[in-house]
């Protein structure tokens, strides 16, 4: 089950936030939550790179608690995709890379009205992203 998605640029600016099956709110503003998320990712990525006993080619990819899993993909441009799911979700790296190439590149990067470094606000992008997420087998409630 997909809970929410953050997309950050290489400077930590929140480019997009989407929410689908999130059951619990954090109690803070979305801006504060995004800053906490980016700070945590920055620290965790640094920690993994420094403490890893082997060369971490991909570095930090995800972490899992007993309630949710956080998945992380960074593309070559420095754009960071963070997806929170239930703990049984698999294939998230491929899902996020497809989201990047099929949705972000097509409906944000190729949009002549979008300015690099500004959040993605296009209604077409939002609609296509929502369609992409809802069409994924990851979207719905897990069957117990």
Regions found by a protein language model. Give the residues of each.
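Acidic, low-complexity cytosolic segments
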Residues: 1-4, 10-144
């Amino acid at each position: 089950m997909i809970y929410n998605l953050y997309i950050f640029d290489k400077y930590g600016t929140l480019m997009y936030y989407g929410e689908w099956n999130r059951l619990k709110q954090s109690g803070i503003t979305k801006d504060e939550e995004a800053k906490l998320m980016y700070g945590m990712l920055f620290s965790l990525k640094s920690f993994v790179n420094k403490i890893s006993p082997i060369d971490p080619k991909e570095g930090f990819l995800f972490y899992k608690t007993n309630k949710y899993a956080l998945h992380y993909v960074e593309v070559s441009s420095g754009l960071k995709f963070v997806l929170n799911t239930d703990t049984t979700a698999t294939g998230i790296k491929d899902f996020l890379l497809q989201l990047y190439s099929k949705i972000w590149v097509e409906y944000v990067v190729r949009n002549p009205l979008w300015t690099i470094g500004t959040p993605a606000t296009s209604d077409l992008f939002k609609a296509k992203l929502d369609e992409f997420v809802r069409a994924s087998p990851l979207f719905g409630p897990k069957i117990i």
